[in-house]
From Swiss-Prot:
Keywords: Elongation factor, Protein biosynthesis. InterPro entries: eEF-1beta-like_sf, EF1B_bsu/dsu_GNE, Transl_elong_EF1B/ribsomal_bS6, Transl_elong_EF1B_B_arc. This is Elongation factor 1-beta. Belongs to the EF-1-beta/EF-1-delta family. Promotes the exchange of GDP for GTP in EF-1-alpha/GDP, thus allowing the regeneration of EF-1-alpha/GTP that could then be used to form the ternary complex EF-1-alpha/GTP/AAtRNA. The lineage of its organism: Archaea, Thermoproteota, Thermoprotei, Thermofilales, Thermofilaceae. GO terms for molecular function: translation elongation factor activity. The gene is ef1b.
Length: 91
C-alpha cells in the first residue's frame, strides 16, 4: 500500500501552548492509519511557536487530507491547521 507524506503547520490557540504539548495531544488523537514521521517547533513571533509535522497516511484515503485536518483541528489547543505540502512517499 502506497503512502503520502503530508507536511502540516499547526498553530496553537495561544502563546502559552508549547509545540511538544500539541504534538502529544495530536499523536494521541490520530487513528492507526496515520503515522507521525517527524515534528519540530517553528518560531512565529512574540513567543508563539507553531508545530510542523510530517504525517504519513494511506494514499487511498477517501477525501485526501480532509479527515486528517478535521481530527487535528478538533484537538484542544489547536487554533489552525495548514497543509503545506503533500507528496507520495516510498520507503
Amino acid at each position: 500500500m502506497s503512502k503520502v507524506a503530508v507536511l502540516l503547520r499547526v498553530l496553537p490557540d495561544d502563546a502559552e501552548t508549547k509545540p511538544e504539548e500539541l504534538y502529544k495531544k495530536i499523536a494521541a488523537a490520530l487513528p492507526e492509519k496515520y503515522q507521525v514521521a517527524q515534528y519540530q517547533a517553528e518560531p512565529i513571533a512574540f513567543g508563539l511557536e507553531a508545530l510542523r509535522m510530517v504525517i504519513l497516511m494511506p494514499e487511498e484515503t477517501e477525501g485526501g487530507t480532509e479527515e486528517l485536518e478535521t481530527i487535528i483541528q478538533s484537538v484542544q489547543g489547536v487554533s489552525q491547521v495548514d497543509v503545506l505540502n503533500v507528496t507520495r512517499f516510498s520507503g
